[in-house]
Amino acid sequence: IESLRRFDPDGPLDAVQAVIPMTGEVIEIRLAAPRPHVLQMLAQPQMAIFSRDGGTGPYRRKAWGKAIILTPVDRLSGGDEPEETPIPVWQTRVIRAERAALAIVRFRERQAALVLGGRLTDLPLLVPAGIDRNAVRADPVQGLLGLAVTGRGRLLDNAAVRAAINMAIDRSQLPALLPIGGWATSDRLIPDQLDLGRPPTEHDWAALSMDERRAQASATITRWRTDRGPPPPLRIALPQGPGATLLFGLLRRDLGAIGLTARRVPLSSDADLRLVDEVAAYDSALWYLGRVGCARKIHCSNDADAQLQAASLASSPTERATRVAQAEALMVAHNGYIPLGAPIRWSLVSKRLNGFLPSPRARHPLNHLFRRTN
């Protein structure tokens, strides 16, 4: 809980006062105030409970070379059938962690029935690998896919420059670069109303055409150059992979169109803009605001952060919602985060895995790959 609170200080777990063991199998979590999304937080994989013998999940694991074999727990702990009864092959899982390109080829050659964890970085590998479109399953996730402003200095401390960068990106070109069914771009910080109490805040330039946006953004950069000289290159931190390369090409082109130069750097390096690619753990405006707030070392609005802290201390749900809505409007106006769309999460699934279902959290329990589960 402490670990999650460090990354989400204004989320549902902010109200946890104590965790008390009641019995060997029951714990009590005491809250200082009601939090409607606390159960969704507790359902995250990070909240799994471990014992000296391992986890509490449906499998026991055993190393097998570079792979891991997962065997159903009920077959090892005195289930309905004797232990010597052979375990059906369909109940055993063999898992590997490897590069996306190798996993995709392994799937194509039918040496693997499932590939999990696909992101935008590796999406362009599917077509040249000859993967059947019907095997590609996209998860209907929401969350953050965009650029956090993490640099400081005269250029990015200028509110008009941050707004110019945000409005200059032609998001309509992204689906052609990253083709996957059901994915949509967005320039909103929060995709839907959720618990905001009103529709998400629109940028004041949202109704402008792309040409009008670029003209306005270019004028901003021209004024900055006239007053202060040539702007420094923007360092953009992106992961490795062809999808990130295509994304950088679009960003470099669009920023160049308004007079800014861009340089790609690794995620481990200092950067001015850094890719954020996270699936929402729960459906609340607080999740989104917490991910781009001051606690994440992003160029942030202190006033918005103060409203978030006030929301945590609010004495009523109405006051809490009001504070959150005020924080959202301030964060959008600050332009410390540049939205691109929803995160992209995909899997490759064999036809025989008839229990596999799309997941709004991109989580796929391995004991639910067939309609009959262990």
Short names for language-model regions:
Residues E109, V141-R188, P232-A244, S316-N335, ...:
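Alpha-helical secondary-structure segments
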Residues F107, F248, R253-I298, A311, ...:
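Periplasmic binding protein-like
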Residues G24-V26, L31-R93, E98-L102:
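Gly/Pro-rich hinge or "lid" segments in bacterial periplasmic/extracellular proteins
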Residues G181-W224, P242-L246:
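Structural transition elements
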Residues G24-V26, A32-P36, Q44-P45, W64-K66, ...:
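Solvent-exposed coil/turn segments that connect beta secondary-structure elements
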Residues G65-I69, R93-R152, D277-V279:
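Extracellular/periplasmic solute-recognition and catalytic clefts
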Residues I29, P82-R96, P230-R235, R253-V265:
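A local structural motif
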